[in-house]
Amino acid sequence: MWIADQWQDYELLDCGGGEKLERWDKQYLVRPDPQAIWETPRRLPEWKRANARYLRSQTGGGHWEKKALPESWQVRYKDLTFQVKPMNFKHTGLFPEQAVNWDFVMEKIRKADRPIRVLNLFAYTGGATVACAKAGAAVCHVDAAKGMVAWAKDNARLSGLSDAPIRWIVDDCAKFVEREIRRGKTYDAIIMDPPSYGRGPGGEVWKLEESLYPFVKLCAGVLSDKPLFVLINSYTTGLAPSVLGYLLHLLVAEKYGGTVSWDELGLPVTATGMALPCGATGRWFSE
């Protein structure tokens, strides 16, 4: 398991009973987590003193029950700064377990010692975009949600990257990649964080288990002659990490050589010393 254990502004204090207790800088949140199936005693007083708790409704969805919580605030990870804002469906705009991937891409870009062009797909609020740009890459950030792209721009600004070479694209990811192929554009690195389920602009159904292979195959068509890495994230519990590795072997490594690795992502749990699983990542890298 790749564990994001370098945080200072974020801490997973405890988890159990389908919930997790987190510290985001000075704010304490309780959020649902389907992986935390165990029942453990809630000894930490922050369980009761949390600034906000997300409560699921029996009809689907849910709502935040807030005591004293700012509308938004900032957290830092090393030299990166992000805006955190609790929103619908329990999310905060940041997945802290992704810090292990930010470290990975920053190291690869810095060691490459050449200009690197990165394509970040389903790029959300831009954690990976900011990491790549901070390491010196030119980034194309693509997400279908206009609000998420605006949030990502804000994260870039907070991290001192207002003038960095980042293209901000609001578009369907598959449609954008198809157009880039027609235009003859290539990238040295690709990052993708596709949803488990979604609908395209024409009502096309996206189901990760059925859509991921053809999508990765499509994306391989925009890789340069000397690619640096390809990274796939998945939060779909039905897909083992090794599935991501298998895809990368078939669609990237067989053409370019290099190395494929895969694993679960996790966050260390302060109360128990264990780690909470938070999805999976597959990585292909050349050097």
Label for each model-derived stretch:
Residues 123, 143-147, 211:
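Short beta->alpha hinge that forms the Motif I/post-I loop of the SAM-binding pocket
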Residues 96-114:
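Conserved alpha-helix/loop element of class I SAM-dependent methyltransferases that forms part
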Residues 125-139:
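Conserved SAM-binding loop of SAM-dependent methyltransferases across substrates and taxa
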Residues 6-22, 29-96, 103:
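Non-catalytic substrate-recognition/targeting regions of SAM-dependent transferases
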Residues 113-124:
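Conserved class I S-adenosyl-L-methionine
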Residues 210-226:
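A short glycine-rich, Lys/Arg-flanked "PGG" loop and its adjoining helix->strand segment in the class I
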Residues 227-287:
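C-terminal catalytic and target-recognition region of SAM-dependent MTase-like enzymes
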Residues 145-191:
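S-adenosyl-L-methionine
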